[in-house]
Amino acid sequence: MLLQMAMDGAADGLTIAEFKEFISNIYDSVDIVEFGTSCVYRFGMEGVQEIKQAFPDKLILADMKIMDGGGHMSRMAYSFGADIVTVLAVSDDATIGNVIGSAHKVNKEVMVDMICVSDIAKRIPEVEKL
């Protein structure tokens, strides 16, 4: 089992330095550091890079909620140190497939976010085929 910690406090005005201090305090207990959507918007890919450089042995999840431009967006996140990116399951199959393809090329991972999916039981096997 892996334990994930979400960094979504950017909306509350927290800084990258404050996030790093918090992660340091729970370092031994967490496996995945989620750089939440609000952090992605506020700090950009440079924020992902700063967290990865500070904690290189932790998995960094960039919660980008990709809807289009899947290949380009995921390649960018991976190049800045993300180990996992999110893509929305409601996006078209080509977008999801492009994110998965980008991940495979650099031995990284994808999390398909089921937010707003009306029939999750139907969508899961569709996504698994990609």
Predicted segments, located by residue:
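Conserved N-terminal beta1-alpha1 strand-loop-helix module at the mouth
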Residues: 1-62, 66-71
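Conserved anion-binding
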Residues: 69-130
